[in-house]
A protein has these predicted regions:
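Periplasm-facing N-terminal accessory domains of Gram-negative outer-membrane beta-barrel systems
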Residues: 2-9, 13-142, 200, 214-216
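Solvent-exposed loop/turn elements at secondary-structure boundaries
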Residues: 156, 169-171, 569-595, 599-742, ...
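Extracytoplasmic gating/loop element in the C-terminal half of outer-membrane beta-barrel translocons
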Residues: 660-669, 824-915, 920, 947-974
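C-terminal beta-signal and terminal closure region of outer-membrane beta-barrel proteins
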Residues: 933-994
Length: 994
């Protein structure tokens, strides 16, 4: 591996400095390249090429090379006019050329001899082809698509699922319910790099997306699924490149109101209809308010744009209520409101003809109430949690043009994130009755704080046939956390209601319920705090896009990345002495993360309409800081727990004097060693996860504005993190034995995918994009970095963990379009069809509750498609085993897994009042045919099905002992605050635009 890296690195540098253009677009920008020829198809060198931003009037110019080739880098995404001038030829003007973020379209222009006509105007569709300069696999969501397609919850990233190679990912952070996670090229979604205006927007604590933005403030975004340039790092899967809107020379803006409620929505298929008939439909309403305004501060000099969005959602969660009269737990609804405020403001300033500056400030304030972490079938209203999330980000961008071939971009960025989950009810112990979880939740209070400072600088230099880029990046992350666990104490009871009087009080009440045991933090008045989980990130890169011939480009680059403290190097001396014998060698930061990247793009007919491309690259993921938090929280001291004995009864079934009761619970005897939660250590040799990416594909404009693309992608990941048990020690803090878990980078993953896209650019009143993905992937864990849920079955045979990831969709098809109809109507549909995701098959609780060791991880919907197929295995498994060790059979007719399908659409009507003012009425339907789509939320059970072989009866003599009628029953439907596929829902809206 190291030899291969060395050879590739040497090749890259040899190519890069052989001759000192095509162009890779930078983060948050676009590029443009092409050739200029005469009517005899001969190259025209030294022609003057000027591009003009039609919204702001800004211009850039260059001259063609000796081969007649021109290149522009670092252009703001916008609609441009291209003007080509050369003595002896008529001036050629190409109008309305749209440059999207991350794209480098090829625009080849033929000059005509000067005659009676001084200027020849060319339609953009006649000359704008496909990207013949880069080898990346990517797609764009443009401003028109963003504004027209129906979005449940109005999160713009929802549209990333329309592009091939991308699919929904599990939500890793239940405290951020208003974010979406994206799985690209088989990865699980913690990684990926999301940049907004070139600034990092990643959650470095748990992974995934950080801040959300008003949809009306987003201009467009690109998602590069594979093989992006050396400028972009910190991602082993995809890079999402988002651009916010900027002002123009004309004032423009609008406002809107979106509304839906329970009467406009169908009921979830998993909701008990008896409950609905008893207490009514679950109440729900959502109002969203939007506003935007932008325009010139000084025409052709300075501009501004701002956008605001507020969501007020009043929903409910199912809760349990202990009915003392009926002596049973009944189900009811408890309020679960969500309030989310989004704002972004931007100013652009052309200070001189060579200097352009941009400033952006964005804010998000989100509060929500939801159910807490449950270990019982249902929780009470007191067991909910209240999350507060605050986000602030500021970006400064300065672009200086030294000459037509040399420019520099500098970015400064600061963002602050604070999540708090305070105590929901004061002075309440959590009580886990057999059927319901009551009192203050065992996992709160919590707090996470992340502050980031980021500096990026990129120098772009076009010389000869080379488009060179050099750059560096620095990020400083300061993080701290408070994580309470059983701080208020959790009491486990044996009964939901007292069955008799057991104390001296003649009244039968809760104080007569026996206690099984009690868990409480050793230091309940001091929630564990982890300060100074900080990290410095450095990156340097060189990129050379070398146009070897006018129709053949080599993309050559190398990137170096270095994190100082993702392995807790700074706090290594604080590790508990009892586990130091398990640490091998010395701990140092991973310093050899070189990422060579090489690719090609060939336009065989040199007409800008065809691209045959491919390449190879190494891409390093970022290690989330929760890995370091695990070592510091689960260190054997920070989260010490005590387990106390429960109630003691005399021969008559009464409490003995002084025994623990709900009136005085914390008087039982501490059980030595029972409070062990495990000690996590980071392996001294842990490295940064990385993926080797290969791709080969083509793109062809088959007819004007119709583009077909197909790419094969192979990705092989190494050094991904897993937690492996390596022994145990005596822990004096708990006075007992504690297990030791080694956090190590010792597992791999694989992905093979065919990505097909057919799209039509907007013309003749319609556009569409159609995508299909055929993919297969494997990994070693349902989480690629945080080994916090379920460890490997055999710590010495990790290959037994190889299986499909929990969100793998073998087939995924999407269609979306916008169609302008007569009389001001617009129709915009989205259709999604995806195959079933796999899930684990868990042993009955009496046999341990882990997955069945003899089958692969996530075997349901892969190895076994039906209940009959699973039963054939179970019958074979049970042969020769005693009844107590046999597995129960499931229903033969059961289909394992659920195909996902949903059809959403928007129908709108615009009423124009003059040339600049309009009112738009909107109706939206999500999941028109009300198809039941079963999907979960997190990676513990993403399928949404009950996946444990729970016996119908616990008595081995009862036939129900060998039946599991509940296995495979739906637990949760898709959809929620964001996304599609949930119960059918109607939404109405009205917008004002000017």
């Amino acid at each position: 591996m190291k030899l291969a890296r060395f050879v590739l690195l040497s090749v890259v540098f040899a190519f890069a400095f052989t001759n000192v253009p095509s162009a890779f677009a930078q983060l948050g920008t676009a590029g443009l390249s092409g050739s200029v020829v005469d009517s005899n198809n001969s190259s025209v060198p030294n022609a003057r090429v000027v591009v003009k931003n039609k919204a702001t009037g800004q211009t850039r110019e260059t001259t063609t090379t000796e081969y007649g080739v021109y290149t522009f880098q670092n252009l703001p995404p916008a609609v441009y006019e291209i003007r080509v001038e050369m003595q002896g030829f008529a001036t050629a003007v190409v109008d309305n050329v749209t440059l999207n973020v991350g794209q480098v379209p090829s625009v080849n222009i033929t000059l005509q001899p000067k005659g009676t006509t001084e200027t020849v105007t060319i339609a953009a569709g006649e000359v704008v082809g496909v990207d013949t300069s880069t080898s990346q696999v990517s797609g764009q969501i443009n401003e028109r698509t963003l504004a027209s397609l129906p979005l449940n919850g109005r999160n713009f990233l929802d549209l990333a699922y329309l592009l091939p190679g991308n699919a929904p990912a599990p939500n890793y952070d239940p405290t951020k319910t208003t974010t979406l996670e994206i799985s690209s090229a088989g990865q699980l979604g913690r990684g990926g790099n999301i940049a907004v205006d070139g600034a990092d927007n990643n959650d470095d604590v748990v992974g995934g997306t950080l801040q959300n933005f008003p949809q009306d403030g987003i201009s467009e975004f690109q998602i590069a699924t594979n093989r992006f340039s050396a400028e972009i790092g910190r991602s082993a899967s995809s890079a999402i490149n988002v651009v916010t809107k900027s002002g123009s020379n004309d004032f423009h803006g609008g406002g809107g109101f979106y509304y839906r409620n329970s009467r406009l929505s169908a009921l979830p298929a998993t909701l008990n209809r008896t409950l609905v008939s008893t207490i009514g439909r679950p109440p729900f309403d959502r109002e969203q308010y939007t506003a935007s305004f932008g325009g010139p501060i000084r025409r052709e000099k300075a501009w501004f744009f701002s956008a605001f969005e507020y969501r007020n959602q009043d929903g409910v969660v199912l809760v349990g209520v202990r009915d003392f009269n009926a002596r049973r737990v009944v189900t009811s609804f408890a309020p679960a409101p969500l309030n989310d405020l989004l704002f972004t403001g931007r100013a652009d300033w052309q200070t001189t003809s060579d200097d352009r500056m941009a400033f952006r400030y964005s804010l998000q304030r989100e509060d929500d109430i939801d159910r807490g972490s449950l270990r019982r079938p249902i929780g009470t209203a007191d067991n909910r949690q209240h999350s507060f999330n605050r986000y602030h980000s500021f970006v400064y961008n300065w672009t200086h043009t030294f000459s037509s071939r040399l420019l520099n971009e500098f970015v400064f960025h600061e963002n602050k994130f604070l999540n708090q989950i305070p105590t929901f009810v004061e002075n309440r112990n959590e009580i886990r009755f057999p059927s319901v979880q009551d009192g203050g939740n065992f996992r709160i209070p919590q707090r996470t704080r992340q502050n980031r400072l980021q500096f990026r600088d990129n120098l772009s230099w076009t010389t000869g046939n080379h488009a060179m880029k050099f750059g560096f990046e620095f990020q400083r992350l300061d993080t701290d956390a408070i994580f309470d666990l059983f701080g208020s104490g959790t009491i486990f009871t044996t009964e939901d209601f007292a069955t008799r009087n057991r104390d001296t009080n003649p009244t039968i009440n809760d104080n007569d319920i026996p206690i099984a045991l009690i868990i409480r933090s050793v230091a309940p008045n001091r929630p564990p705090t982890v300060p100074n989980v900080d990290n410095n990130f450095y990156a340097f890169y060189v990129q050379d896009d070398w146009k070897v011939r006018p129709n053949f480009t080599l993309n050559l680059g190398v990137r170096y990345e270095f994190d100082t403290n993702t392995k807790n190097v700074k706090n290594f001396g604080d590790i508990f002495s009892i586990v130091r014998p398990f640490l091998r060698g010395t701990r140092n930061s991973d310093k050899n993360n070189f990422s060579p990247r090489v690719g090609f793009n060939w336009d065989p007919w040199n007409d800008g309409r065809t691209s045959i491309h491919g390449g190879y690259g190494i891409y390093y993921d970022r290690i989330v800081l929760e890995v370091a938090l695990l070592e510091r929280l689960l260190d054997g001291r920070a989260l010490p727990l005590e387990v106390r004995t429960g109630s003691v009864l005399d021969a008559n079934g009464n409490f003995v004097p002084g025994t623990p009761t709900l009136a005085n619970p914390f008087v039982g005897t501490i059980i030595p060693g029972a409070g062990a939660v495990g000690i996590n250590i980071i392996d001294n040799n842990m490295g940064t996860p990385y993926v080797q990416q290969y791709n080969f594909g083509f793109q062809r404009e088959v007819f004007r504005d119709y583009i077909l693309a197909a790419d094969y992608i192979h990705a092989f990941g190494s050094s991904f993190i897993i937690g492996r048990g390596i022994g145990s020690v005596f822990n004096p803090v708990i006075n007992g034995t504690d297990s030791v878990v080694n956090l190590e980078s010792s597992v791999k993953n694989w992905y093979d995918g065919l990505l097909v896209n057919f799209q039509k650019r907007f013309s003749h009143n319609y556009s569409f994009t159609m995508s299909y993905t055929l993919a297969k992937s494997f990994n070693f864990s349902n989480d690629d970095q945080i080994p916090f849920q379920v460890g490997p079955l055999d710590n010495n045979r990790l290959r037994l963990e190889k299986g499909p990831p929990p969100n793998e969709e073998r087939h995924r098809f999407t269609f979306a379009g916008t169609f302008d109809l007569p009389y001001g109507f617009e129709f915009a549909p989205i259709y999604t069809l995806a195959s079933a995701v796999p899930f684990d098959i868990q042993l009955p609780p009496d046999l341990g509750g882990t997955r069945i060791p003899q089958i692969q991880r996530n075997a349901a919907a892969r190895t076994f498609k039906t209940g009959a197929e699973l039963n054939a295995f179970i019958n074979q498994y049970n042969t020769g085993r005693p009844t107590a060790q046999r597995l129960p059979l499931v229903l033969d007719s059961l289909d394992l897994g659920d195909i996902f399908t949903s059809f959403d659409f928007r129908l709108s009507k615009k009423f124009n009042f003059g040339e600049r003012f309009a009112i738009q009425g909107i109706g939206e339907i999500f999941n028109l045919f009300n198809v039941t789509n079963i999907r979960g939320v997190n990676n513990v059970n993403y399928s949404g099905f009950q996946n444990t072989l729970i016996r119908d009866n616990e008595n081995p003599a009862n036939p129900g002992f060998l039946r599991s009628s509940s296995f495979g029953t739906p637990l949760q439907t898709a959809g929620g605050v964001f996304g599609t596929g949930g119960p059918r829902a109607f939404q109405i809206a009205v917008r004002v635009v000017f």
